[in-house]
Curated annotation (Swiss-Prot):
Protein name: Elongation factor Ts
Keyword terms: Cytoplasm, Elongation factor, Protein biosynthesis
PANTHER family: ELONGATION FACTOR TS, ELONGATION FACTOR TS, MITOCHONDRIAL
Family: Belongs to the EF-Ts family.
Keyword Cytoplasm: yes
Subcellular localization, as worded in the UniProt entry: Cytoplasm
Region Involved in Mg(2+) ion dislocation from EF-Tu: start-end pairs: 79-82
Principal place of residence: cytoplasm
Record GO terms (molecular function): translation elongation factor activity
CC annotations in GO: cytoplasm
Length: 307
């Protein structure tokens, strides 16, 4: 397969690797972008695929909650100017509230009736496009619900009540005190916003993702020239660390790095007065997974921290 300049540029943007390294990686992997990323990582040239950290679209994340049930939605716009528009912000809040009465899927939310217009959410968004003069789309939504307990919420970079650039839901099952439960739930939600875990528990991580990491670690370890039995132990150790870093419960708690999230939740059971189980998490970052070259979420966060 012919390696084009556009392919090299895309790989450079995703990995930060040099142009010649990117060209070689693509040649070695027959133009397979994901395989080329792994090839660069195995050679120690790139740490990881950066694409998940790049902001790709404007708009807002909206959250609505009823205590034991909460939903997070993403509505994209073309410009940040529209995202600051009062009418657009009200639309995002309204769609989130409508979504709370559905199963949380984009299809169900789109077909649901928007009370203020009497039309479907889909048609209401179309009307807003005509009024505001910019394309908009309901891109993603997620819903969590528990029978006993709470679904805690957190909005980062809030533009107003329940709307912002990043939204998190954390479902906690417990028969204990709701106020205390919501307090630890909000802390865990803030932690999820900061660390973006792949799953609640290591056993829930996609086997394909784990296998991909193992293969990269194997290639990296082989470069040491050590015997296979030593390499196997090295890889096993790195996989244990990988699971600890990407599974929520085993991560160091952002609020207190001296304990894990699991330990923090266990400690909170004293004030809650009952056992707590993390039943699920949902995290939506605006524009995640759809790249936009001129905007880098990591750079925005760094700039905000300095300002």
């Amino acid at each position: 397969m012919t390696v084009t300049a556009a392919m090299v540029k895309e790989l450079r943007e995703k990995t930060g690797a040099g142009m010649m390294d990117c060209k070689k990686a693509l040649a070695e992997t027959n133009g397979d972008m994901e395989a080329a990323i792994d090839w660069l990582r195995a050679k120690g040239i790139a740490k990881a695929d950066k694409k998940s950290g790049r902001t790709a679209a404007e708009g807002l994340i909206g959250i609505a909650s009823s205590g034991t049930k909460a939903v997070v939605v993403e509505i994209n716009s073309e410009t940040d100017f529209v995202a600051r528009n009062d009418a657009f912000q009200e639309l995002v809040r309204g769609v989130a509230n409508v979504a709370l009465g559905t199963d949380g899927s984009v299809a169900a939310v789109s077909k649901a009736t928007y009370p203020a217009t009497g039309k479907s959410v889909e048609d209401t968004i179309k009307d807003a496009i005509a009024t505001i003069g910019e394309n908009m789309t309901l891109r993603r939504s997620a819903l969590l619900e528990v029978e006993d307990g709470v679904v805690a919420t957190y909005v980062h970079n809030a533009a107003g009540e329940g709307i912002g650039k990043l939204g998190v839901l954390v479902a906690l099952k417990s028969t204990g005190d709701k106020e205390a439960l919501n307090a630890i739930g909000r802390q865990v939600a803030m932690h999820v916003a900061a660390t973006n875990p792949l799953a609640v528990r290591s056993s829930e991580i996609d086997p394909a993702v784990a296998e991909r990491e193992r293969n990269v670690f194997i290639e990296q370890s082989r470069a040491s020239g050590k015997p296979d039995n030593i390499i196997e132990k090295m890889v096993d150790g790195r996989m244990r660390k990988f699971f600890e870093e990407v599974a929520l419960l085993s991560q160091a708690f952002v609020m207190n790095p001296d304990q894990t999230v699991e330990a923090a939740i266990k400690e909170a059971e004293k004030s809650v007065g009952a056992p707590i189980e993390v039943a699920g998490i949902a995290r939506l970052l605006l524009g995640e997974g759809v790249e936009k070259e001129e905007s880098d979420f990591a750079a925005e966060v760094a700039a905000a921290a300095k300002g």
